[in-house]
């Protein structure tokens, strides 16, 4: 409280009596005012669409050469401030009165703003005003963790370090990924009945307590969800889109086989690098190589060079020479057959996935600008497994007050099985089976699973991990699509898929699942592109 009072006094001083240019401020004060301006824009008090970014005073602000007081006063004169949101008489107030009202608005709002308070706490920690040990004890005081006398005493007497304490709590999932809101902290999974297209499960993590938003909204709880850095209000199964990584190679295999640029027996040599285009892209195994692979083996090995070659051949098919647009047209054609350029038909909010629009060689391995939801990948792998492109539905039936069924719903579908011959489908399916049968995550697993992993890179962040598949391999009953955004490796998504399949077939109990520990909680994790 005293630190907050000091900070608010400092902000008030900057806004009124002793302004200084941004470039002379301490990092702490600069961060505070950066947040304040952002808050004003979010609240639509500072009208960002009205700001003339070519204005000389604005340029001085961007160059940190003027004070917040000078900038905000100038914003008022330029009508960049919506004074209707301030407690002033719009008709008669002069610029001084408007500025005073704006200052009061700022000071009132940051006093109760959680995100602004976090800036204060951050610098208190940096200065050593709050110790790591105190932070750990606060978790008990605030009810984040169940009180434990033994652990509290160990923290207090120094026999348990804050680092070891946190690592153990994370490992035991007493502190959850959602609470940390550090990558990775989100995930999604869709399980579908392969025979009917009925969605068996659709999971978005993190979630929230919907009971607090029904029959009267708990405003405090809703506000906490809105400010939660893990964005629990976003449905990660239907609304989040990322690159698909190598899960897209099943589309490329389909296109290559259907367009006869490869056969099921054709072999392509991987030397670790693809020399037929100017940027010479590498296989993930480089500086190693896969040698000769046919399409099934290329799916098993996730060989980039094989699928670069397929993309290049698709781009040359129409004219005999490379044409970017022609290659993309064919990739889009087969992505469309699998429904990847459409919404899936769900009755809830869903983002539309998007198929690559350029660079067919890179698009063929899931790069370029491919971007898909988890539910779209689910429909895609269901189509691969069944030869049917379903229009998904969440509604199962409607019943009246007496429990009598009024209406039943059933997913309709388009038969796409004639896209490939039975031997071509077999080649894709056997490749998917080999992916899983050679994967350490599935060793000793009694249920035969077929699947495809995908690792999608995102600049400046950990890789996304994806897995699509179906089980049992010989007579599929369910399909599954898993994405762990920024999950480092596709093998982490594959592990999650194995756990879901194991639970579905009652190989694992809920008790077993609840006793599972956090993978990688020892901090020894890194990006992997071996998918």
Predicted regions, residues:
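Beta-lactam-recognizing serine transpeptidase/beta-lactamase-like catalytic domain environment
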Residues: 2-246, 251-485, 528-531
């Amino acid at each position: 409280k005293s630190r907050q009072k000091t900070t608010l006094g400092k902000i008030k001083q900057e806004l009124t009596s002793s302004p200084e240019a941004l470039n002379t401020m301490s990092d702490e004060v600069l961060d505070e005012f950066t947040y304040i301006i952002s808050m004003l824009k979010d609240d639509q008090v500072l009208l960002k669409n009205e700001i003339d970014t070519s204005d000389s005073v604005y340029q001085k602000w961007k160059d940190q050469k003027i004070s917040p007081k000078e900038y905000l006063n100038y914003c008022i004169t330029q009508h960049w401030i919506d004074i209707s949101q301030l407690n002033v008489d719009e008709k008669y107030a002069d610029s001084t009165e408007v500025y005073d009202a704006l200052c009061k608005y700022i000071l009132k709002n940051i006093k109760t703003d959680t995100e602004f308070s976090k800036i204060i706490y951050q610098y208190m920690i940096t200065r050593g005003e709050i110790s790591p040990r105190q932070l750990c004890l606060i978790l008990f005081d605030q009810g984040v963790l169940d009180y434990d006398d033994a652990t509290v005493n160990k923290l207090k007497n120094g026999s348990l370090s804050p680092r070891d304490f946190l690592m153990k709590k994370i490992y035991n999932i007493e502190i959850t990924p959602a609470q940390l809101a550090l990558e990775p902290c989100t995930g999604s999974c869709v399980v579908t009945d392969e025979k009917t297209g009925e969605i068996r499960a659709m999971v978005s993590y993190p979630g929230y307590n919907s009971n607090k938003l029904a029959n009267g909204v708990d405003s405090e709880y809703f506000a906490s969800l809105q400010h939660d850095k893990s964005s629990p209000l976003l449905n990660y199964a239907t609304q989040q889109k990322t690159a698909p990584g190598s899960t897209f190679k099943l589309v490329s295999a389909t296109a290559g086989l259907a367009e006869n640029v490869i056969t099921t027996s054709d072999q392509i040599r991987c030397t670790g690098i693809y020399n037929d285009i100017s940027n010479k892209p590498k296989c993930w195994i480089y500086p190693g190589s896969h040698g000769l692979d046919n399409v099934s083996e290329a799916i098993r090995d996730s060989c980039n060079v094989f699928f670069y070659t397929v993309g290049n051949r698709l781009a040359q098919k129409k004219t005999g020479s490379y044409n970017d647009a022609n290659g993309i047209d064919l990739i889009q054609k087969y992505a469309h057959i699998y429904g990847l350029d459409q919404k899936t038909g769900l009755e809830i909010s869903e983002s539309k996935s998007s198929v690559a629009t350029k660079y067919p060689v890179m698009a063929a391995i899931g790069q370029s600008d491919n971007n898909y939801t988890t539910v779209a990948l689910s429909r895609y792998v269901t189509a691969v497994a069944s030869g049917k492109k379903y229009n998904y539905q969440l509604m199962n039936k409607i019943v009246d007050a007496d429990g009598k069924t009024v209406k039943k719903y059933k997913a309709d579908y388009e038969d796409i099985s004639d896209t490939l011959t039975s031997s071509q489908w077999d080649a894709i399916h056997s490749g998917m089976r080999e992916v899983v049968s050679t994967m350490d995550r599935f060793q000793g697993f009694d249920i035969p699973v077929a699947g495809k992993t995908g690792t999608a890179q995102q600049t400046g962040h950990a890789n996304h991990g994806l897995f699509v598949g179906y089980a049992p391999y010989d007579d599929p009953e369910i399909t599954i699509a898993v994405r762990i955004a920024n999950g480092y490796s596709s093998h982490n998504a594959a592990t999650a898929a194995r756990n879901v399949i194991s639970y579905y077939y009652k190989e694992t109990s809920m008790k077993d699942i609840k006793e599972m520990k956090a993978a990688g909680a020892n901090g020894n994790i890194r990006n992997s592109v071996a998918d």
